[in-house]
């Protein structure tokens, strides 16, 4: 019996990444809050994208590979189209699509291979970016590590939900997920503390957009905690969190709307306002809930899915 590919908790986590980006882009934040949040919403978005690639690639074939490549290319094109209206926002879709293409072959690998590539990407990113003193907007090597990290979190938190597993295997997976979450809590506590330490070694910086070991490990740890919590809440209170899950199912659509509305708002009304950010979040939650209930798939998601099926029909490349 096939398991459902739509996981409520994963959709909630995806919506929290979008909400986090809205807050960072639009809200008037205290310096300390900026330090805490810097880079985490976008890295969470990337890590969840890596986990989503694993869901797409469960029955991996050459068709899957071609469709992931095509998906990445389409995301890049959408990102490029948004660049002229990005305004104060550094559009994340270009790097998202590029990394998706670069790691499109990895869902076919085993967990240990992906772990090895995660370590390699993290080391390469640290070697490259540690000497740099200025923040990197979206450092490519670190983003490759984020996507692979998301694939590893799929193995820990999601695989058993999508595959028929025995009771003993489910118990093992459950224990592993709690162990990973517990370790992630410790890493997050340490990382958040040292985000405020300017004297820390360059390779160990935990601050956002540095692309080094500290930030990468912290970002994956935060994503693990968020994902585990969202899965817990989504399993037990799906009705209460429906608006967030709905937003998560159409995150591309909401992100596009966010960039477009933020460009107008910040050019013509207010550059940064916490009230405005809250208003847009509520607006997008309502819009997503209504669209999901009465229409279904988000318009951008439907457009991308239709284009992918047209470009790479089922069975192509086998």
Set out the residue ranges of the language-model regions.
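Alpha-helical transmembrane segments and their immediate juxtamembrane cytosolic regions
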Residues: 1-318
